[in-house]
Amino acid sequence: VHWSAEEKQLITSLWGKVNVADCGAEALARLLIVYPWTQRFFASFGNLSSPTAILGNPMVRAHGKKVLTSFGEAVKNLDNIKNTFAQLSELHCDKLHVDPENFRLLGDILIIVLAAHFAKDFTPECQAAWQKLVRVVAHALARKYH
């Protein structure tokens, strides 16, 4: 994947403003609420029976932060995303059996969360760079499936 200097700048400058705990929790909660079939991968998280329960669930919050923290590794390693996510791809494919389509869904949700949090800074150019990034990350995570 080739990243222009502008794309790299747009991604890293926005990332510097992201509250990983809050945005990660919101992104995962939205995924579980908007796409309820994804909840089956999180049965050990306890009560996911309603949007209120999901939003207030500390395990959802903690895992959302973990997910977005690992996304930060992509931001730091834009030129080596495939290798950055090799182990996570293996885990999600071989052990967790996560449908790779869920990676794309989470990427789309992350775009919505970023747009909501950074409306003024989330220009069309910024969105284009982030769409490319979430697509590349989703592809890297799905790599072990192919």
From Swiss-Prot:
Expression by tissue: Red blood cells.
The keyword Metal-binding is assigned to this record: yes
GO biological process: hydrogen peroxide catabolic process
GO cellular component, one term: hemoglobin complex
Domain Globin: 2-146
A Pfam cross-reference name: Globin
Function summary: Involved in oxygen transport from the lung to the various peripheral tissues.
Protein name: Hemoglobin subunit beta
